[in-house]
C-alpha cells in the first residue's frame, strides 16, 4: 500500500533525497518567500510557475569569485531584456534583485 504522509514526514523524505549536483549549489533565492535557502534539496519549481505550465523561463548564471560578483549590471540588463522578450514579468524590480544578490 502506498503511504500517505503528513507534512513533516513529506519534508523529511524530501530532505533525504539524493540531488545530483547538489554539492555545486551553495544557495538559492525563493522569490515567493523573499528569502535565501542553503539546502539545495528544497529547491523546487512550483506547478503554477511559467517554467512548468508554459515551458518558458529566463535564467542567468552569474560568476562569483574572490567574494565579488562579476559583471552584475550586465547580467541584470540581460535578465530584464530576456524576460521582456518572452513577455514575462520579473518577480521584483531589477534594483531589488541587485540588492538581493549583493
Give residue spans per PLM region.
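Conserved alpha/beta cores of soluble small-molecule-handling proteins
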Residues: 1-102
Amino acid at each position: 500500500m502506498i503511504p500517505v504522509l503528513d507534512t513533516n514526514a513529506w519534508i523529511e523524505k524530501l530532505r533525504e533525497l539524493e540531488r545530483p549536483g547538489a554539492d555545486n549549489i551553495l544557495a538559492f533565492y525563493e522569490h515567493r518567500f523573499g528569502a535565501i535557502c542553503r539546502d539545495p534539496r528544497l529547491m523546487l519549481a512550483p506547478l503554477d510557475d511559467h517554467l512548468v505550465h508554459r515551458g518558458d523561463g529566463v535564467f542567468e548564471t552569474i560568476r562569483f569569485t574572490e567574494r565579488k560578483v562579476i559583471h552584475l549590471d550586465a547580467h541584470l540588463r540581460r535578465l530584464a531584456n530576456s524576460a521582456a522578450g518572452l513577455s514575462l514579468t520579473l518577480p521584483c524590480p531589477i534594483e531589488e534583485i541587485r540588492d538581493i544578490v549583493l
